[in-house]
């Protein structure tokens, strides 16, 4: 199985080009104002024009108002929504769009394999469950987490993908993919020179590391 790759937190046209040329399957835009990688709908609409067909655009939100999500739907037309805050299943599903639900592994209630698995089951209609590490704030932490917490998570890739995030970079992504065998990985700070500024070289290194694992697994 080929591991899919999402590069998140893009803010520049040249970084979209680098990700696409390296073989990324999805591009993520962050619509969380507190993030250093935040873009507004107008800017995201400009960037979206650089994304070719067959590369998905994912819109990341943290506890958004419905009108904020609607503005992104209207201006950007993302392929997937991603919810990274305290959104309920009803919050995530109200837009009638495919969505990813992010879980901060290690957070209170999500600090055991059983607790994390139970939380996932509440979002059975999600297109994917994304697992990130816990930090006091919202959004990606850039830190890893104990992948043993995923032991109780069961998902059918045909209906709900497992997406691994949390401190992934070219130096550790191969081991992470080998251990978890996720449908996809989601990487942001691990391929950056600065927040929101991606490194074409690091993106290529990341893709090569993932490909090396996938080839052995065939």
From Swiss-Prot:
Belongs to the TrpF family. Pfam families: PRAI (PF00697). It catalyses: N-(5-phospho-beta-D-ribosyl)anthranilate = 1-(2-carboxyphenylamino)-1-deoxy-D-ribulose 5-phosphate. The keyword Glycoprotein does not apply. Gene3D superfamilies: Aldolase class I. The gene is trpF. Its EC number is 5.3.1.24. GO terms for biological process: L-tryptophan biosynthetic process. Keywords: Amino-acid biosynthesis, Aromatic amino acid biosynthesis, Isomerase, Tryptophan biosynthesis. One of its GO terms (molecular function) is phosphoribosylanthranilate isomerase activity. This is N-(5'-phosphoribosyl)anthranilate isomerase. It comes from Bordetella pertussis (strain Tohama I / ATCC BAA-589 / NCTC 13251). It is an enzyme of class 5 (isomerase). Coiled coil: none annotated.
